[in-house]
Amino acid sequence: MYYPEPIARLIESFSKLPGIGQKTATRLAFYTIGMEDQDVNEFAKNLLSAKRDLSFCSICGNLTESDPCAICTDPTRDRTTILVVEESKDVLAMEKIREYRGLYHVLHGTISPMNGISPDEINVKTLITRLMDSEVKEVIIATNATSDGEATAMYLARMIKPAGIKVTRLARGLAVGSDIEYADEITLSKAVENRLEI
């Protein structure tokens, strides 16, 4: 189907987002074009601001406006526990439940032998270094319940246990193959509460 070039480029841009197919990208493009100029400008400004003003915390790897992040510098946090997640959006999901008061570590992915992703390509080395220089007594592995998430959890457990640090995994209220960000708050709360030692 023919679209004027500006619309075609906008559709292409939207379709690059995860989970957005051609139909949804087309709907979003036409919706955006129909928005008030002020709303489009605000949307563009917010998008550029997020891209420009956010970076990764040098300690935990979470998205932040300042380095180190607010969680890492919060003196009320339990510094003896680190919860390891795949992505920054998982930190947001865990924070919503208000059940966990320790620190985080964001891997920015998982080990995936099928996709050629090794431990060196995710944020593992900084976790190991961080554990050696801290008072951490427990690492809770909260990777997703997928084959790559499981492989990553097992690898991390093998790397961390020799240091004498307790390694636990979220309990299974989470469906196999599901992502943490989509779990409801009660399920996540119970998964943290009933975590299992690996």
Swiss-Prot record:
UniProt entry keywords in alphabetical sequence: DNA damage, DNA recombination, DNA repair, Metal-binding, Zinc, Zinc-finger
GO molecular function: DNA binding; zinc ion binding
Zinc finger boundaries on the chain: C4-type: 57-72
Chain ranges of the Toprim domain: 80-175
Entry keyword annotation includes Thylakoid: no
Keyword Transferase: no
GO annotation (BP), single: DNA repair
InterPro entries assigned: DNA_Rcmb_RecR, Rcmb_RecR, Rcmb_RecR_Znf, TOPRIM_dom, TOPRIM_RecR
Family indicated by similarity: Belongs to the RecR family.
Primary role: May play a role in DNA repair. It seems to be involved in an RecBC-independent recombinational process of DNA repair. It may act with RecF and RecO.
Protein name (record): Recombination protein RecR
